Amino acid sequence: MPPPGKVPRKENLWLQCEWGSCSFVCSTMEKFFEHVTQHLQQHLHGSGEEEEEEEEDDPLEEEFSCLWQECGFCSLDSSADLIRHVYFHCYHTKLKQWGLQALQSQADLGPCILDFQSRNVIPDIPDHFLCLWEHCENSFDNPEWFYRHVEAHSLCCEYEAVGKDNPVVLCGWKGCTCTFKDRSKLREHLRSHTQEKVVACPTCGGMFANNTKFLDHIRRQTSLDQQHFQCSHCSKRFATERLLRDHMRNHVNHYKCPLCDMTCPLPSSLRNHMRFRHSEDRPFKCDCCDYSCKNLIDLQKHLDTHSEEPAYRCDFENCTFSARSLCSIKSHYRKVHEGDSEPRYKCHVCDKCFTRGNNLTVHLRKKHQFKWPSGHPRFRYKEHEDGYMRLQLVRYESVELTQQLLRQPQEGSGLGTSLNESSLQGIILETVPGEPGRKEEEEEGKGSEGTALSASQDNPSSVIHVVNQTNAQGQQEIVYYVLSEAPGEPPPAPEPPSGGIMEKLQGIAEEPEIQMV
């Protein structure tokens, strides 16, 4: 049996045609394309005189429909769109076969449980597959031939000496300056330019950039009783230790807004923040009035206000409730029909309960003089073991980000004390697994199993806990940066999740005058 994550690529594949009721099967892509091309020729050109007469009668109403099973694609533009689409079905069939082989090689994994009827729904594809390798620009309608063509560029690429380093291969894609130690790495890199996928789920049809991501797709559907790896920060569970490590990186902030103090874990989060908080651009405009907004969701909510009749009505028998917005009808379902009137939010200071998070936010700000974290527009709440949502008391900042903050001038920040390197030393708390610069795609076969409810890693990246303290009058805010390991000392051995590190940290935070964000 191959190692975990490896796909046994076979020469002979089981490629079954799904055009209409056709049951043709072959083992090579060349024969498969030759067969499907015959379907396309017959479908596009026809063979009877009656079809030709109908075509002459209604030349403007010609449609190019795909007859592949469970596919509703129809092109009104040209037959070329249909040809590219159907050829992608052929390529997709091969990827699903590789996905099936991958599952068969993993005895511990079951099948995908998502909708089988979506297995042949493929994404929108470009007008043509264009190679942008230097001095090439060949164009293809067939994705299989396109990806093989680009792969040939990587195999024919010559090694070049760059400075004092060993010879490398250069990516010749337009606008790319990447270099690689060998051709195999260049070949993998080119997939980021072509958006090539190498495996697909045989059940739901989802396509993936590598086999590891496909197997993760299956593992994420594991039943809850088999998800043995739990995040100590948000209590989510995962089937493997690596999935937990990937998830925990989302809790560590690596990026800071250049215009305010907001920090976040992902570049996409920073882009969204910049668009919503610092940009006045409102690209989504209402056709009925002068209203404009920054995202499609807000526009859809606004359009509901133009409807004379309520757009949503309750489906429950004998209930006449109606509403203009989706938010209102969902709130009605929760409160009236799902029994969601019990308070779910609890103040961690005085134990007062609330049914909505924004009511708890008002309570924390007015009753206990809590402040929003600098640069953040709201509080975050976390579900605890008793089922109540309480204020999230810990925020993780990477060491690199905190050092960047320390280098910035502290004038006008409102801090009661100045921050320097000496104030950060000597306090050992804990390490959080995960490297901020880790590649998004891992090598195949690196998925691993573990036996504990916490993640571990040979080289965990240092993390800083940011603790905001506010006095009883709410006059001053002091920020303490706590290093995860003391300078000059080896990192402490990781403790099990029940070892009390997080409990001690939160115990300190739950004092009335402490706010941990």
Swiss-Prot record:
Alphabetical list of PROSITE patterns matching this protein: ZINC_FINGER_C2H2_1, ZINC_FINGER_C2H2_2
Top-level taxonomic group: Eukaryota
Reported tissue expression: Ubiquitous. Highly expressed in brain, heart, skeletal muscle, spleen, kidney, small intestine, placenta and liver.
PTM field: Ubiquitinated. Ubiquitination may lead to proteasome-mediated degradation.
Residues that span the membrane, as ranges: none
Principal location listed in the UniProt entry: nucleus
Region (Disordered): 431-460
Region (Interaction with NPAT) residue spans: 373-517
Effect of mutating Y381A: Abolishes DNA-Binding
Pfam families the record matches: zf-C2H2, zf-C2H2_4
Keyword annotations of the record: Activator, DNA-binding, Metal-binding, Nucleus, Repeat, Repressor, Transcription, Transcription regulation, Ubl conjugation, Zinc, Zinc-finger
InterPro entries the UniProt entry points to: Znf_C2H2_sf, Znf_C2H2_type, ZnF_E-box_Homeobox
Localization: Nucleus
Function: Transcriptional repressor that binds to the consensus sequence 5'-CGGACGTT-3' and to the RB1 promoter. Transcriptional activator that promotes histone H4 gene transcription at the G1/S phase transition in conjunction with NPAT. Also activates transcription of the ATM and PRKDC genes. Autoregulates its expression by associating with its own promoter.
Subunit structure of this chain's protein: Binds MBD2 and a histone deacetylase complex. Interacts with NPAT.
Listed name of the protein: Histone H4 transcription factor
Organism, as annotated: Homo sapiens (Human)
